Amino acid sequence: MGYKVEARSMEISMEDEDSRKKRKKGLNLPKKMKKILRNLWNVGKEDPRRVIHALKVGVALTLVSLLYLMEPFFEGVGKNALWAVMTVVVVLEFSAGATLRKGLNRGLGTLIAGSLAFFIEWVAIHSGKILGGIFIGTSVFTIGSMITYMRFIPYIKKNYDYGMLVFLLTFNLITVSSYRVDTVIKIAHERLYTIGMGIGICLFMSLLFFPIWSGDDLHKSTITKLQGLSRCIEACVSEYFEEKLKDNETSDSESDDEDLIYNGYNTVLDSKSADEALAMYAKWEPRHTRRCNKFPSQQYIKVGSVLRKFGYTVVALHGCLQTEIQTPRSIRVLFKDPCVRLAGEICKVLSELSESIQNRRHCSSEILSDSLEAALKDLNSTIKSQPKLFLGSNLHSNITNKHLNGHVSYYNETNSNGTVSYHNDNNTNGCVLGETIEENDTVSPLPLNSVVSLSSLRSVKKSAATGEKRRLRKQLSKIAVMKSLEFSEALPFAAFASLLVEMVARLDTVIDEVEELGTIACFKEYDKTVEVRIENRLI
């Protein structure tokens, strides 16, 4: 009896738990629906053209469905209208270039395959039943092998792979089916017509109703990359020299700056595949500009490649902000003004390049102005004015020079703890130069003020330590390394400054490629009077 009561109570508890879970799911359902709707809204908000493309696909499917819905069309086309629907679903892409590429590939592949299959069918009919079958089998093997091998050619694979696939499928279906079915050629003709109708509807919707040009997307992408690099450099320099305060607001602003920097150069570094795809689609697009100039897709790819190389320097500059050993802010402040000025000039050049591409005009002949050269000289003179930070103190430099010349005098002494240490007689602080050896170690004494070479000193130490157990010092920490190397605290800043100078050097290549782009794309010439008018309006 007690067992039944326990079982019943367990069942009741399980039912209560299930009911609680169901209520919890019911309460979470509105939140999930709200999240889904928010995601759908964000997709359209990021690019409103996605909404337009969805509506265009809906209209195209509605138009092609009229072949089924309207009686006159259905009597003329019949059940083959299904191929028109399939064509619209497969061919209609986001951009006009992608739709043209896929539509022409499908249309030409179907047309050529049907024509070749009709010729083979005609030869097979006039060759008899047996010879016709042999001829069809041989043709299928030859054409199938040849087309499959041609698909490995890089140019064909890049531009005509879909057309080759459609050709291979259509050719085999018609050729093999025609051997047993007499009406297959008629069916192929009807399907060819319906496929043509589907392609025509796709091109009509893609080219005439709110067309989306891949060339314009590539053009805008190049502008975005230049602007992103400019903002990224500005954020890196400002973060490197700013005073950090321990507040929640500053931590939030730092995270925003980090996101800005990451997004700035990641957009450039991850753009290769997207740029190549846009350039490939742009080749298929008609000349739709005012002057009907050919779109220089390959030059845009070259500009993107140069910007990626420039972006690697920006990544290294951002890495200077995250190194373990940092230059003290008291030293950074000494070089803040020239570095900020140089970074500002670099950003100014990148902004000018983005504006020239955006307005489709050539750059100013004075884009590398005297102010950029003056900023470089200012940074150089500022660094030269602080030689001790980069070369060490006079004492350290004298010791280093003597080491390089191979003439250093040492003496040994016994400390109170019974260890023997080597000292430099020029070092008043008595810094330990070598390893400490235990008390019972025998060392050949070096006379005071004797001059020996560094190699002889090493040989003496090596012979004295033969067969003996050494006691090594503890591993130096980061702070000890900083203290032992007087000039090391300025080395991280030296890397930062050298990267800024490297950016100036790489600007020449970027400017050359942008100017070449303007020449090929027939950009308008730079008009200084227009710039003066704009500046006056802003003032």
From Swiss-Prot:
Claim: Transferase is one of the keywords in the record: no
GO biological process: malate transport; monoatomic ion transmembrane transport
Matches recorded under Pfam families: ALMT (PF11744)
Protein name: Aluminum-activated malate transporter 13
Gene Ontology CC: membrane
Role according to the record: Malate transporter.
Alphabetic keyword roster: Ion channel, Ion transport, Membrane, Transmembrane, Transmembrane helix, Transport
Subcellular location, record wording: Membrane
Membrane topology: Multi-pass membrane protein
Family: Belongs to the aromatic acid exporter (TC 2.A.85) family.
Listed InterPro entries: ALMT
Residue intervals passing through the bilayer: 57-77, 80-100, 107-127, 130-150, 165-185, 192-212
